[in-house]
Regions:
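C-terminal motif of bacterial Sec signal peptides marking the signal peptidase cleavage site
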Residues: 16-19
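Glycan-processing catalytic domains of CAZymes
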Residues: 21-269
Length: 269
């Protein structure tokens, strides 16, 4: 499920940190599929698929759902933590003593162990099954959630580990004809597109945390921002009127409830 970066890491620090890392090779080029629609109106449907409001031309859905015909469709994959109910071997998840390490906000999700090249390769082979499902279903792109899991790893993982693993996943997505989206993790800066190969960004609450520029400076109009009704620092109309806000910005309920659910809320800039 969506999880926003918990670490407030400065961009300048991140560039110093990652500048010491030489990638094994340049990222695979973006596929020649449908271009990212910078003028889109988006909906974020991870809580369940439903017919979107009129005018929506970009939709993100879980990998277990079908893409929306006629729209640019993004397939959600929990790339750095286990999905609830998925059984992962002990040696591919981190441990806190004898217990599997969990995300404190999502206690049914374990943090995947990507601390070595061998573990990254083994974990990627499992995630690649979901990527292949997205491609076979007809999605245009994927987003890999919990890229920031290293911040919840009790120092077992580093940003460099996350970069190396993300590079494997993005390369595989590109091989299958899918564009790939960076999820949150503003500290990446230009490492996102230049080293890993991300094609766009999916961001949660960049206005709330006053960091939208960290993404638009890198990806321009290829940024989707989701703000949430329970954590707005100002009225949504003011968010939309701000030139710093990504053009593709929506307001959703925290649980991303489907249309028809009393908790459902959707607005778009």
């Amino acid at each position: 499920m969506p999880a926003r970066a918990a670490a407030a890491v400065g961009l300048a620090f991140a560039l110093v940190l990652t500048g010491c890392t030489s990638p094994p090779s340049a990222p695979d080029p973006a596929p020649d599929g449908a271009p990212f629609p910078v003028d889109a109106t988006a909906d974020y449907q991870l809580g369940g698929a439903y017919p979107p409001p009129a005018g929506v031309t970009l939709v993100a859905r879980d990998s277990t759902e079908e893409p929306l015909a006629g729209a640019y469709s993004i397939c959600y994959i929990n790339g750095f933590q286990t999905q609830p109910g998925d059984q992962w071997p002990d040696d591919l998840v981190l441990h806190d003593g004898q217990q599997r390490l969990v995300d404190p906000n999502w206690p049914d999700e374990n943090v995947i162990d990507i601390s070595t090249a061998e573990k990254r390769a083994a974990a990627a082979s499992r995630i690649e099954q979901a990527i292949a499902t997205c491609a076979a279903s007809g999605f245009d792109a994927v987003e890999f959630d919990n890229l920031d899991s290293y911040t919840r790893s009790d120092d077992h993982l580093t940003l460099d580990d996350a970069i190396a693993f993300a590079s494997l996943l993005v390369d595989r997505a590109h091989e299958l004809g899918l564009s790939a989206g960076q999820k949150n993790t503003s500290e990446l800066g230009r490492v996102g597109p230049d080293t890993i190969g991300f094609d766009f960004a999916v961001v949660e609450e960049c206005d709330q945390f006053e960091e939208c520029g960290a993404y638009t400076d890198v990806y321009g109009g290829r940024v989707i921002d989701i703000e949430y009704t329970d954590a707005l620092r100002r009225p949504f109309v003011e968010v939309c009127a701000d030139a710093a806000t990504p053009t593709i910005t929506i307001l959703r309920d925290r649980g991303l409830a489907p249309q028809g659910d009393p908790a459902h809320h959707y607005e778009s800039c």
